[in-house]
Amino acid sequence: MSDLVKSSEVIETTEVPPHNNNNNKRHFKYDSEQRKQRLAGGVKLKDALMILCAGFALISDGYQNNVMSMMNKVFALEYPKEYTASLSTQVSNASLVGTIFGQVIIGLTADYIGRKWSIVTATCFLIFGTMMCAASHGKTVNGMFWMLTIFRGVTGFGIGAEYPSSSVTASEAANESVKRRGGAFILATNLPLSFGGPFALCIFLIVRRICGNHLDAIWRTMFAIGCFWPLSVFYFRLKMVTSELYTKSAIKQRAPYWLALKYYWPRLIGTCVAWFLYDFVTFPNGIFSAGIISNVIPKSEKNNLEKIAEWNLLLGAIALPGVFVGAYVVDILGRKYTMMIGFCGYIVFGLIVGCGYHQIKPITGLFIVFYGLMMSCGNFGPGNNMGLTSSESFATPIRGTAYGISAAIGKVGAVVGTKTFSPIQKNLGDKWTFIIAAICGLAGVLVTFIFIPHLKDEDLLEEDVKFKNYLIDNGWKGKFGIQEYDEEEDLEGSSEDSSDGEIVKNNTKNDVEKVDALK
């Protein structure tokens, strides 16, 4: 059988298997010249707006993920008898459980229904859930906390929905005309997520000054402010257009999930397990950071909300530069090695703080610096690259689903980490939370090395071509793209009108006939 023409930019070429006797089987061929032409034209306005609209509201996700850090302290002061450790875990985990459902369900619909529908749905859940959290009430304090728990779950569903819909949309938009796609993706997605933590603390300090000791007003205001970011981009998200990649490669009917699993299972294991390990460390350290800090500051400041928030803000400020450094090097080193370096940071700083905990604890500033550097390494490596790798490792027809599953397994890690954090502190001691972080870092290095592919800035369309040819070779008979193509017209199309991919028909004379397949 004939080999496909090998392009200088194509890392792998797809061939019809030698044992395949079907000479009428059609295949796609990746055309690297089309991508060169796209990139030569510079960043298009529509692509830039799609990236910004997809990522901007993730500030709200970062805000919601981190707001509970200080709210746990506020609730403990306002309701010292009712707000027990188990209730604190219940309220904190409600968002994470909702996030898991949002990631899986909206991940599926992002592929099956569409990117725009999914991202608008995510925005609606975020706005509604956050507003109802601020309005939580009940006949009893426990009743109020149950309402808060339920609507933290609704908010979590919106947060989870944002992950696959926003990240996949940003990745596909960046692929169209952005040369250093990895850095652009990180600045549009993980930067808002990471900035949400310090932003939440800045808002808390302002609200605390305004409201004084009116703790009820503080927590209701803090939840209500979370509506602002999704509201600010809601109109623009309604006007978003569908990416070219999704238009060309979507599978609307009879999605071949079993074939996809057989093809992508090593990558799916890598993204799921690595994300589980990352969230197992970073989420409890974010949610309970106020409690961790209150254990190392002087006793006179343990219940001083402003002091705790200020130290927490310093912690977030030290962790944030990891996002920028990681965004700069990710297209140079590649996703895989950047992730491995970040996990190594968990090993180094986790062991420094854990093994030297009792020596470092009396020096609050030094403790915060080492703690912040550990979190910064998390941002530099897996924090930046889990979303990026999950959106680039899979073809467009299943990208949302695979991303949603990977992120959901990550949030399972967050739930497990949050649930076990307090028992670890109580039974093993505070230092073991950092030693376990180092162990997770070692596991993350191994998983990344074995299962995560070495990606830099490859065209996402190239992965689509490989996956389409794999489906064809395995007898799948469905259609690609939003529009249904007439097969006779496809076979009669000219190569001069071809876009980024072409269909190749192998005949008995081993000739290669190029025809247009992606208009």
From Swiss-Prot:
GO molecular function list: glycerol-3-phosphate transmembrane transporter activity; glycerophosphodiester transmembrane transporter activity; transmembrane transporter activity
Listed PROSITE patterns: MFS (PS50850), SUGAR_TRANSPORT_1 (PS00216)
Biased composition (Basic and acidic residues): 508-519
Record keywords: Cell membrane, Glycoprotein, Membrane, Transmembrane, Transmembrane helix, Transport, Virulence
SUPFAM superfamilies: MFS general substrate transporter
Pfam families xref list: Sugar_tr (PF00083)
Spans through the membrane: 39-59, 94-114, 117-137, 141-161, 186-206, 216-236, 273-293, 313-333, 337-357, 363-383, 404-424, 432-452
Residue runs in coiled coils: none
Phenotype of null mutants: Abolished the utilization of glycerophosphoinositol(GroPIns) as a phosphate source.
Main location: membrane
Catalytic activity: sn-glycero-3-phospho-1D-myo-inositol(out) = sn-glycero-3-phospho-1D-myo-inositol(in)
Keyword Transmembrane helix: yes
GO biological process: glycerophosphodiester transmembrane transport; transmembrane transport
Region (Disordered): 1-32, 487-519
Protein location: Cell membrane
Comp. bias (Acidic residues): 487-500
Stored InterPro entries: MFS_dom (IPR020846), MFS_sugar_transport-like (IPR005828), MFS_trans_sf (IPR036259), Sugar_transporter_CS (IPR005829)
Protein name (Swiss-Prot/TrEMBL): Glycerophosphoinositol permease 1
Species of provenance: Candida albicans (strain SC5314 / ATCC MYA-2876) (Yeast)
Gene name for this UniProt entry: GIT1
